[in-house]
Regions:
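Charged, terminal alpha-helix-loop-beta segments
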Residues: 1-255
C-alpha cells in the first residue's frame, strides 16, 4: 500500500479491502469523508480514516446474511441482508438530517444503527460550548419527550446546560440518532456505539462515561456498546466467513 508523508493513500481504492460499487460509493458520499480540504486530501484517504475502517469491516456484509454480524455486535433478533452506509436519520427538524455510519435493515422494518469511532473519541470534547444547535430547543420545544423519549430529553437538557460534562463521549450525536429512530417509527431498533479501543487512562474515562450514559438511557432505548476488538474476536471465530476478509482485517487493524 503506497502512501505519502501525511499518511494518505493516492487513491481511495488503495485504502479499502475491496472496491466500492456505485451504490455504496453514492451512500458514502452523503457524509463528509470524501470531501477534500483546501490543502489536504479527503479524510477517507488517510490510513487512520474512520470511514475506511467502517467500509473495510462492514461493506463485506452487503447482500449477505447478517446474523453473524449482529451476534458479533451483541444485538439479538432477526437479521437481514441490506446494509446502508451514511444512512440519514431525519429528526423532523430543519436542516440536513444527521447520518449514522451504518444501518443494518431488518426484514421486519426495523434497523440497527451503528455509530462508529476510530480515533475520534480520543480528542477531548470542547468545553464552554452549547452542544446542540438552537433548533433542538426552539421555543421551549422538547423534541425527545415529544417522540416518547423523556430520559433522552433530560440528558439533552443536562448536556446543553453543562450539568452533564463528558470528556470523550459524543453523547449529543447518540441522542440525535435516538431521536431520528423514534421520529421514523423505529424506536425499538438497536443503537450500537462501536469504537476502536486503545489502552490507557483515556480509555478508562471513556468507558466510565459510556457506563454512565447507558445507565441513564437503557430503560428507554436499546443502546449497545462494544469495541472493534471485541467485534473482530467474534467474527474471526465465526465459521464460513471468507478468510481473505478476516485476514485483511487482522493484518490491517488487529495484528
Amino acid at each position: 500500500m503506497g502512501y505519502d508523508a501525511r499518511g494518505c493513500v493516492r487513491a481511495l481504492a488503495d485504502n479499502l479491502r475491496a472496491p466500492l460499487d456505485d451504490s455504496a460509493l453514492a451512500e458514502l458520499q452523503r457524509g463528509s469523508e470524501l470531501e477534500p480540504g483546501v490543502t489536504q486530501p479527503a479524510r477517507a484517504f488517510a490510513l487512520c480514516s474512520s470511514a475506511a475502517l467502517v467500509v473495510n469491516v462492514f461493506a463485506y456484509w452487503r447482500g449477505r446474511d447478517q446474523t453473524p454480524l449482529l451476534a458479533a455486535l451483541g444485538v439479538a433478533g432477526p437479521a437481514g441482508t441490506r446494509l446502508e452506509l451514511e444512512a440519514p436519520l431525519p429528526t423532523g427538524l430543519p436542516g440536513d438530517p444527521p447520518t449514522v455510519d451504518v444501518a443494518l435493515h431488518r426484514p421486519d422494518g426495523r434497523c440497527v444503527a451503528v455509530e462508529s469511532k476510530f480515533a475520534e473519541w480520543l480528542t477531548r470534547r470542547p468545553r464552554g460550548q452549547r452542544v446542540f444547535k438552537d433548533k433542538y430547543f426552539a421555543g421551549g420545544a422538547r423534541v425527545w419527550e415529544a417522540a416518547g423519549l423523556p430520559a433522552c430529553q433530560a440528558l439533552a437538557e443536562d448536556l446543553q446546560a453543562g450539568r452533564e460534562r463528558l470528556k470523550h463521549l459524543n453523547a449529543p450525536q447518540l441522542l440525535k440518532h435516538a431521536l431520528g429512530l423514534a421520529v421514523n417509527g423505529l424506536r425499538t431498533s438497536a443503537l450500537v456505539y462501536l469504537y476502536y479501543d486503545r489502552p490507557g487512562r483515556d480509555s478508562a474515562t471513556h468507558r466510565a462515561e459510556l457506563a454512565r450514559i447507558v445507565a441513564r438511557l437503557e430503560a428507554e432505548i436499546d443502546l449497545c456498546v462494544t469495541t472493534y476488538q471485541e467485534l473482530f474476536g467474534v467474527l474471526s471465530a465465526t465459521p464460513g466467513l471468507d478468510r481473505e476478509y478476516v485476514d485483511y482485517l487482522k493484518q490491517r487493524y488487529f495484528a
